[in-house]
Amino acid sequence: SDAGTYDIKVLGKGENFTDGRGHNETRFDAGGRYWAFADFKPTGGLNQVNKTEINVLGTPAKAIAYTQAKLSANVDGFSLSMDAGHDGTGFSSGTQQHIPVSIKQGGKAVDPATFENYLGEKAHLVMVEVASKEFVHTHPSVENGKLDIHTTFAKPGTYRGWLQFQTDGK
């Protein structure tokens, strides 16, 4: 089947490692083809991303086709809403995009400037293009009480994204 129809999910996150080795335990709920991304910065080096295909025995989950934009989410008591590009018409590839993200908790706006630093930043956004599995990692800035994502999509496509931030040690 088409690689672009496989579901893309965050299955687990490793921890900071100082000894050059890493460990991550992940439970796969279904068999099938998965991609693992290791995003790291060696001491004195530049950011690197290693991508590895993992084939898990068992019955694969039903493939999911992403055909509709989803620019909002409710997770752990927070509501997030992403603006559809700078002019509200969508995103473009090949040019710098500024994408504001509004965050609420209990219906009230949350200023991301109040977030704790997590791995040295107020937030991390990881996006993966569904068909090519292109990996994008960016650190949104805090502007006007919102997170502002500054990124360039190299190619047109459907991207799935995960935003990480920390409040109250979580």
Segments (PLM) and residue ranges:
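N-terminal soluble domains immediately following signal/targeting peptides that reside
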Residues: S1-K170
